[in-house]
Amino acid sequence: KVDSILFSDLDVYESFEKSYLADLSKEARKLGIVIQAGTGGICPTSKSFKLKHGSAVDHLKLLIRVAKHIGSNVARCYLGSMKDRLSKGGIQQHVNQTVQVLKKVKKDALDAGVTIAVENHAGDLHSRELIELIERAGTEYVGATIDSGNATWTLENPLDTLRNLAPYAVSSGIRDSMVWQSERGVKVQWTAMGEGCTDLKAFTSEWQRLCPKLPMQLETISGFAKEFPFLDEDFWTPYSNVSARDFSRFL
């Protein structure tokens, strides 16, 4: 039975008017469903940032208002994607910008009773980097959205991602991944749960132990594989902070 759903994009709503969102929330409650509100990237220097909803700060303030009116105590968003990790200057410059944006909406989030849930998204942030971002911004109003599929795009075992982010997690988008050897390293393909190589018995057991009240919301994306040519020497520059221990657990 579905009892929780993450609307990860603002485009799902016909209107941002308070009355419309309140009616939608009322219908969800009748069905016993909790809605979590979300949007896309909120880092102004990210290659994937869009001005559709104004500046990064305006975008995030809109998300917080939507979350409040729809009855969501979560506002999911993300920094960007792997392209930002691979960009000149690396991911840290974008982390810095995202922290600045988050701090500018601190009062809005606290007044609304909403936790901004930053996701490890499309290879942008390793779980340890996301923790750094959350703690720099402030854990009283910023938390994490756990994405087990995106974990593999930062050379991380999803179990490690779960264990690291569980203390901060308020939302989730969960899927499996298949990882196999390639000529230059490995290839990764996201799959439906049970069709990849994640130890689901261990994963669900750890979930129950570490964050039993956190909804496990499935997000199925598949159909393509991405290669990580770690045997190439120049591959490692954007991943220089990935420890040998973490990488061995990924493999």
Task: For each feature predicted by the language model, list its residue ranges.
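Hydrophobic faces of well-ordered beta-strands that scaffold small-molecule active sites
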Residues: 3-7, 33-40, 75-77, 116-118, ...
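Structural motif
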Residues: 1, 8, 69-70, 167
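Short, acidic/polar
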Residues: 1, 52-66, 154-164, 200
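Histidine-acidic metal/acid-base catalytic patches
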Residues: 127-142, 152-251
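Conserved, mostly hydrophobic/aromatic
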Residues: 28, 67, 98, 116, ...
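A short, hydrophobic secondary-structure junction motif
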Residues: 1-5, 64, 102, 106, ...
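Active-site acidic/histidine proton-transfer and metal-coordination neighborhood
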Residues: 23-37, 46-143
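Acidic-and-aromatic substrate-binding clefts and catalytic sites of carbohydrate-active enzymes
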Residues: 8-20, 43-56, 83-87, 120-127, ...
